[in-house]
Amino acid sequence: MDDTAITKGLARTAVRSDEAATPGQVGMVTLVSGFKLSCALFGGDTRSAGRSSFERVQIGALIKVPTASTIAFGFVDSLALQNPGGNSAGQGVAVAEIELLGELVPPRPGMPPAFSRGISVYPVLGAPVFMASPDDLSRIYSKPNSPSLAIGSLYQDPSKTAYLISQEFLCKHSAILGTTGSGKSCALTVILRALLDAHPNGHIVCLDPHGEYGAAFPGIAEHITPQTLELPYWMLSFEEITEVLCSREPIARSREANILKDAIIGAKRDFMGDAGQSAFLTVDTPVPYRMPRVVQRISEAMGKLDKPDNALPFLRLLTTIDNLRQDQRYAFMFGGLVMRDNMAEILSRILRIPVKGKPITIIDISAVPSEIVNVVVSLLCRIIFDLALWSNRETAVPLLLVCDEAHRYIPNDESTGFEPTRRSISRIAKEGRKYGVSICLVTQRPSEISESIISQCSTVFAMRMTNEKDQNLVRRTLPESAAGLLNTLPTLRQQEAIAVGEGVPHPMRIRFADLDGKYRPHGDATNFPRAWETDQNGLEYLGEIIERWRWQSH
């Protein structure tokens, strides 16, 4: 039925259950309360086969209700059968709760009907309820006028494309949330590949904690592994180098930190020589210094002690530094035979300035020692923000930082995690937009992530979640309510998501596009049954592993 005819002819007429329903009508409004409607569904005798409306109206379905001057749309939030035993005729009443989404407003002359979020005219009691048609879906979820990218299809009609508004997604923060196995890695890959296909000169840095994204961007990614990573120790802030070198016990840590601070400042001044700015150096100034000079200064300070008993913190520092310099796992930080100021080269490689055909950097931190992985993440996030902070606004390079397993670095419990890492990510979340830095958080434990940070995300893709705490967190922090969709979170299939926020035209349930096998992240679980079919590994297999283990090389 034509939308105009529905609006003019039916909105003012209450439809009683004993009257003939308008063709296509599935029910009528029985309650209006804020952004919620109750609708009595048509279906005849609940003990008979006449259940067409019952079968068509499903949780998450999009319906429409004509009003006096608009057509309101909403998602089915819940379904119930009231008085199922019914009367002697065996009839009951099926009721649908509907969460309103927006409305189709009358078109201006020569213009098609325009959909807008929010409701200006509410449906009246008795107003007819219809299922949204394919044309309705096309109007509501049509390709936006601003630059947008296809990332999948609509749940209600797989032939309709789901779009991502690239500017709104990139200029603000985002999150991909879902339990393990829901398809987060593939969803992220679909989004990033769509962005890079449209913007081949982009700048994306992806922190890869499991080593799974390297194969997803062949030919267009700078893939950095622990064997090829270069983050020299002199780029660390004092908090970060203290975390690496000093003891965990608070009193000992404080003593060692004071010793280390004096040694580092002196070593930096030694490296700068007579440079005019050396007098303004601080312990956090990112200039090179030689670790042997730090060791020398610590040794000299220890030699001036009056009591040998006070030498313990000095000895601990010297022992730790020596151990780390010998440990091949830390070679990316403490290796290198020649000390030089190559900060610009390091930033160029990580941030893709210039792009040189590789607009994304995949930093595989899966083999970074667990003792310092938080320090590495803190350093990377900090240098990304600081570079943007000190750039000229007119020439600044916008950058997207993707942080997988975000709950590791910004836990909700402030007593856990590494405070500088939390602070670095928090600065990006709270201030990054002003400087052209946005962040995409990916996690399977949204309830364990800092709520103040995740609440900064303006676009959210919520995938399957079965944990009630996670679901409640999503409901509290999403930029807009879509309860009719969010109630489906526990039942979403793999690759499906509830997409809400400013990066999508309207709240929607989508299925992400299928990835070609060669672009799929390598995050699949080990196939135990297949591996256990044969007994092919022996002592030689163990010997090879032990060799790599001992000499810390792959």
List PLM regions with ranges.
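Basic- and hydrophobic-enriched, low-structure N-terminal and domain-boundary segments
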Residues: 1-177, 394-397, 413
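Glycine-rich phosphate-binding loop of nucleotide-binding enzymes
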Residues: 146-231, 451, 499, 529-532, ...
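Conserved beta-strand position immediately N-terminal to the Walker
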Residues: 174, 363, 440
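Loop/turn-to-beta-strand initiation segments
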Residues: 201-204, 357-360, 396-400, 435-440
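Hydrophobic residues in beta-strands of the RecA-like P-loop NTPase core, especially within AAA+ ATPase
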Residues: 207, 403, 442-443
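P-loop NTPase motor domains
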Residues: 211-222, 233-238, 243-424
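Conserved ATP-driven motor cores of ASCE-family P-loop NTPases powering translocation/secretion/packaging/pilus
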Residues: 247, 426-431, 435-513
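Conserved P-loop NTPase motor module
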Residues: 494-554
